[in-house]
């Protein structure tokens, strides 16, 4: 491993040894090798690179005395500054932990501090024409312009020739002895408050966890700022790549105007021709999320959908030699570009070509940059240091001397030292309230108002469109609905209310989903708003994350709860953290529908329909809803959609599979598990706020409180009916919301009887019941309590499932045991 001290000493020694150029060039001139960069642009890239390197050193210095809390360095990856230069500052960028130079250059671009390219010269004619090309067979010295017999005939003042060849901005100084000397101005010195210093302040604030840090406000160290179009990400193992795919797809759909004609399209946060850039390193390239994202990108391109995403992989050589190149090059549907990431001129040239191709074609590409990992977790070849390569380019091209670049390095180093000392004195987050303020704001009054406004629109201006969408017969006129039918109708009403709502998932369009819940939606709203995806849950959630970030309201469906478990990091690490990592500047509203919970009726479920929800309830800020009845499902879904729009909430709507098509409660044909769909005029009155339970009174309702959810509601009501025949009055509390739990309702209804039976269809260990009992203990409940829960087992197939799951009989027996105390 190259230590920070060794790396710094080596770079300083190499800069000092570079010497001075043989011939000085003006910074406004292009590189002599015909590259697209000017000297000023190359110098700006060097500034971004050295700022990033010095931030690495500053981070080590701060951590040395316990004030720096983040030490993943960008050293060796600074070539990505050239990628930033090849893009526009309005192109959304999702970076990774080693993207320091990219961030610094993007900040300079946004501040107008990155020099513009020289204007294209007009075609040369007449007196402006270049020298005539020598005729074949004649040497250049023998060629002469038209009208001259030979070069000796030209009447040109040698002084004019010398002056004309001087660099722009240079001059001739004549001393007392009459000797003339060409003088080229020194390099402009970095200002203490320039864009690179400002970017460094951002990063240093993140390193010391300052509450003034512009992205996460001291909550985490990320690269992110809304005004720079840099979206903060955890970038853990490439987990941000699926979001980039979703963002690219959403931007292209918005650009193509796929919203319905009667809906007002909201202004997209990025330009219509923006491209998404997503950076990752070779360490992330083999992780599941990255593989899923690249596969999904290629699949969409294969099907004809356009996704303008430029993936940038910085290959530090940690994988087997040639492996990353082979895998990226072989990706179908993704155009491959490659460059030496230590050479800013080559990187800029190829990155500009790749970015322009993606921008024009609206198709995906990957830019594979060779890099070197220095300092942390690396033992790369210091001779390939990108800073040293850029310095050599500046010196050999005649723009600077090694001494000047070393002085620049030192001056910037002292600037950053002063900034580091200043941010040390800035306030830190000092209270739980400050920390969680932007995690998941809850504004129930605004959510309720949004539901009321949707109702007013559906009953008023939108009544005609609603009638047409439902074929002239809205759901409130079709008679009692099942759970599945109620959800289908509520989805349709949600799509009518908000033109940006999109429903997607595996087979949700063509087949209406696994259980027919989305049947008919594509016919009503079109393939742009209801569409099929690959079955991979990570990819589906990534599409939702990107769509929400772009201003849409995504409603993805995951086929089964088991599949969601394999993709939960997209919820935990990406969706739920967006506001937390951006102080609310970015948000990704989303309502994830997932059929789940094990069926005691015979389907079983460890292979498809898991009965575990613990991993979802553990995610801070995530809303978890479990509707049991049709007359709860529709208003709860409306609440989730409204909360997503108003607060940017991320909601998981778990739909009990076993109850989808159930019609009866107590006896066959009683139709008591169906319900009328509420007309729009009743939506506001029947609004179900997040975190509010529903209570059913059976008999006197004074002897026992049964707290449950999902399948447990139907079973508990049947058990309560049996107990009522024995003279026991019960109140059944349907939690409806598992995160946040309806604690106030739990305490009130438990205290009313003094006996609580918690019926938890999830597993005994880590199940919902643990949270309910903890809430009772925390609030000082002193009555009796007992729990009936599923066994700590996977759910077997068929009738054997009844041996491990909760049943009405088990609930009845548990109640009798509790009452006998």
Question: How does the language model describe each region?
Answer:
Residues 1-87, 94-97, 119-137, 146-151, ...:
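Conserved acidic/glycine
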Residues 82-89, 245-256, 295-304, 329-331, ...:
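Alpha-helix C-terminal capping segments
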Residues 54-57, 61-140, 147, 151-162, ...:
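Cofactor-binding active-site loop characterized by glycine-rich and histidine/acidic residues
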Residues 299-311, 529-532, 576-595:
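A glycine-rich helix N-cap at a beta->alpha junction
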Residues 83, 104-109, 288-292, 320-324, ...:
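Short acidic, glycine/serine/threonine-rich loops at helix termini
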Residues 226-425, 618-754:
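Glycine-rich ThDP/TPP pyrophosphate-binding loop and its adjacent helix/strand module
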Residues 61-66, 219-234, 260, 272-277, ...:
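Glycine/charged-rich beta-loop-alpha catalytic/anionic-binding loops adjacent to active sites
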Residues 69-77, 97-98, 221-242, 339-344, ...:
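Active-site nucleophile and cofactor-binding loops and adjacent substrate-binding regions
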């Amino acid at each position: 491993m190259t230590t920070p001290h060794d790396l710094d000493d080596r770079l300083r020694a190499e800069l000092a040894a570079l010497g001075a150029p043989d011939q000085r060039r003006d910074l406004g001139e292009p590189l002599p090798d015909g590259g697209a960069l000017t000297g000023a642009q190359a110098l700006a890239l060097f500034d971004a690179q050295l700022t990033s390197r010095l931030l690495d050193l500053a981070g080590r210095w701060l951590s040395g005395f316990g004030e720096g809390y983040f030490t993943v360095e960008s050293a060796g990856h600074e070539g990505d500054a050239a990628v930033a230069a090849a893009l526009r500052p309005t192109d959304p960028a999702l970076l990774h932990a080693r993207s320091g130079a990219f961030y610094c250059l993007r900040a300079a671009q946004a501040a107008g501090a990155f020099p513009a390219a020289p204007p294209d010269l007009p075609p040369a004619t007449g007196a402006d024409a270049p020298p005539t090309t020598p005729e074949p067979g004649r040497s250049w010295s023998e060629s002469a312009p038209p009208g001259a017999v030979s070069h000796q005939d030209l009447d040109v003042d040698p002084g004019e020739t010398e002056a004309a060849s001087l660099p722009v901005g240079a001059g001739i100084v004549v001393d007392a002895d009459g000797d003339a000397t060409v003088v080229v101005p020194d390099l402009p010195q970095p200002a203490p408050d320039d864009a690179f210093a400002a970017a460094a302040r951002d990063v240093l604030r993140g390193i010391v966890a300052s509450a003034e840090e512009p992205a996460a406000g001291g909550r985490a160290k990320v690269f992110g700022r809304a005004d720079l179009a840099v979206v903060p990400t955890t970038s853990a193992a490439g987990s941000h790549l699926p979001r980039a795919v979703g963002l690219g797809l959403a931007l292209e759909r918005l650009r193509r105007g796929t919203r319905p004609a009667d809906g007002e399209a909201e202004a997209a946060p990025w330009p219509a021709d923006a491209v998404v850039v997503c950076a990752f390193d070779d360490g992330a390239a083999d992780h599941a999320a990255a593989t899923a994202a690249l596969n999904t990108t290629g699949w969409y391109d294969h099907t004809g959908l356009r996704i303008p995403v430029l993936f940038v992989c910085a290959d530090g050589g940690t994988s087997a030699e040639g492996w990353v190149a082979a895998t990226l090059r072989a990706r179908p549907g993704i155009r491959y570009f490659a460059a030496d990431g230590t050479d800013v001129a080559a990187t800029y040239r190829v990155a500009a070509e790749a970015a322009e191709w993606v921008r024009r074609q609206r198709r995906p590409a990957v830019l594979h940059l060779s890099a070197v990992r220095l300092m942390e977790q690396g033992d790369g070849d210091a001779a390939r240091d990108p800073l040293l390569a850029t310095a050599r380019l500046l010196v050999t091209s005649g723009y600077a001397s090694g001494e000047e670049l070393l002085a620049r390095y030192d001056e910037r180093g002292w600037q950053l030292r002063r900034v580091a000392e200043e941010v040390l004195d800035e306030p830190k987050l000092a209270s739980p309230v400050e920390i969680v303020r932007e995690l998941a704001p809850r504004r129930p009054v605004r959510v309720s108002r949004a539901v009321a406004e949707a109702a007013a629109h559906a009953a008023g201006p939108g009544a005609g469109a609603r009638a047409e969408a439902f074929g002239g017969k809205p759901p409130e006129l079709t008679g009692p609905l099942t759970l599945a039918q109620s959800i289908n109708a509520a989805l349709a009403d949600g799509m009518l209310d908000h033109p940006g709502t999109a429903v997607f998932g595996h087979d949700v369009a063509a087949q209406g989903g696994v259980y027919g819940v989305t049947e008919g939606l594509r016919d009503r709203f079109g393939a742009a708003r209801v569409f099929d995806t690959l079955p991979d849950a990570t990819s589906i959630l990534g599409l939702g994350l990107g769509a929400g970030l772009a201003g849409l309201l995504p409603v993805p469906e995951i086929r089964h709860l088991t599949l969601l478990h394999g993709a939960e990091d997209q919820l935990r690490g990406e969706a739920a953290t967006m506001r937390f990592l951006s102080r609310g500047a970015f948000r990704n509203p989303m309502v994830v529908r997932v059929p789940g919970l094990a069926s005691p009726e015979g389907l079983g479920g460890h292979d498809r329909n898991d009965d575990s929800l613990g991993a979802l309830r553990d995610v801070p800020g995530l809303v978890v809803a479990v509707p049991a009845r049709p007359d709860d499902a529709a208003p709860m879904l409306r609440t989730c959609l409204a909360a997503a729009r108003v607060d940017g909430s991320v909601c998981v709507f778990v739909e009990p599979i076993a109850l989808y098509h159930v019609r009866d409660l107590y006896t066959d044909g009683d139709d008591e598990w169906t319900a009328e769909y509420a007309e729009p005029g009743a939506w506001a009155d029947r609004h179900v706020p997040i975190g509010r339970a529903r209570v059913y009174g059976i008999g006197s309702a004074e002897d026992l409180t049964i707290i449950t959810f999902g399948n447990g509601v139907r079973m508990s009501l049947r058990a309560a009916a049996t107990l009522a025949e024995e003279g026991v009055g019960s109140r059944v509390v349907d939690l409806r919301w598992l995160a946040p739990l309806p604690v106030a309702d739990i305490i009130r209804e438990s205290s009313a009887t003094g006996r609580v039976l918690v019926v938890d269809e999830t597993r005994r260990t880590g199940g919902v019941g643990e949270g309910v009992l903890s809430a009772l203990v925390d609030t000082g409940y002193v009555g009796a309590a007992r729990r009936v829960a599923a066994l700590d087992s996977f759910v077997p197939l068929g009738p054997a499932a009844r041996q491990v799951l909760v049943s009405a009989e088990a609930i009845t027996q548990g109640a009798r045991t509790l009452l006998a105390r």
